[in-house]
């Protein structure tokens, strides 16, 4: 118990400092110049997890998964480019339905990754904060379930559909597919933990931090209009809302299943 308390006393302030510095960097530096300091801050967060993992009650696998997500996200800016995959899918659908559908399947998973330096730099601090809270609320498999499944179903599918309806490429912001699903799920999980779970003070802090991330992301979560056009670019607001809502719902089942496992 003492080890966990000490770890949490180090964990919360250190995470908030990393997020605050990342937010400042994203605000004052051009996107590509901010990539290096953002990468350093992300690795600092991973290092923090590795050092405090026992006190936080997580294993090395959890830390490795977060590291992989960070590295793939940075690589995506230069290599994967989900928007290009979607554009290719829409083009192929007009010529070869099977090939176009294959590209769409690939895009559904690629949609979890950032499409540009601006996307990554703009959303990474919020992703780190949401992940920091999720680690305290969910086991690894539920973290992946809440982030990946809600992201693919909410943002990935809606982006494909809206791009076809609007006949233009509709984009999402950075890691928002994963972030929005996690945000909704930990909002529900921390609230339920606050009401009937142990460690209520931790759940309270997690709930308040998640409310802050919701506030910061509010302009993306309002689904009207479903596609917001800024400088000729269509932004998928409906998908962000759908992922967030899916996260809210899926957390109810995750929390119930966790409680049943603890009672057995």
Label each region the model flagged.
Residues 3-263:
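A detector for small-residue-rich transmembrane helices and their helix-helix packing motifs
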């Amino acid at each position: 118990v003492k080890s966990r308390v000490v770890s949490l006393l180090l964990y919360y302030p250190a995470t908030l400092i990393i997020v605050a510095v990342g937010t400042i960097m994203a605000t004052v530096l051009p996107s590509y110049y901010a990539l290096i300091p953002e990468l350093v801050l992300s690795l600092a967060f991973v290092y923090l997890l590795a050092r405090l993992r026992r006190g936080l009650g997580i294993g090395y696998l959890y830390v490795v998964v977060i590291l992989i997500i960070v590295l793939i996200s940075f690589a995506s800016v230069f290599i994967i480019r989900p928007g290009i995959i979607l554009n290719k899918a829409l083009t192929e659908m007009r010529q070869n339905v099977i090939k176009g559908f294959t590209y769409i399947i690939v895009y559904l998973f690629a949609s979890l990754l950032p499409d540009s330096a601006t996307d990554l730099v703009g959303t990474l601090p919020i992703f780190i904060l949401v992940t920091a809270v999720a680690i305290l609320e969910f086991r690894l498999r539920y973290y992946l379930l809440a982030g990946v499944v809600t992201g693919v179903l909410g943002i990935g599918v809606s982006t494909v559909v809206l791009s076809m309806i609007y006949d233009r490429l509709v984009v999402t912001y950075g890691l928002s597919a994963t972030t929005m699903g996690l945000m909704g799920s930990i909002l529900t999980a921390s609230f339920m933990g606050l009401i009937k779970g142990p460690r209520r003070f931790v759940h309270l802090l997690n709930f308040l931090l998640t409310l802050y991330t919701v506030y910061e992301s509010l302009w993306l979560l309002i689904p009207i209009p479903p596609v917001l056009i800024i400088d000729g670019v269509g932004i998928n607001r409906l998908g962000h809302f759908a992922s967030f809502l899916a996260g809210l719902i899926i957390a109810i089942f995750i929390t119930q299943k966790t409680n049943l496992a603890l009672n057995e």
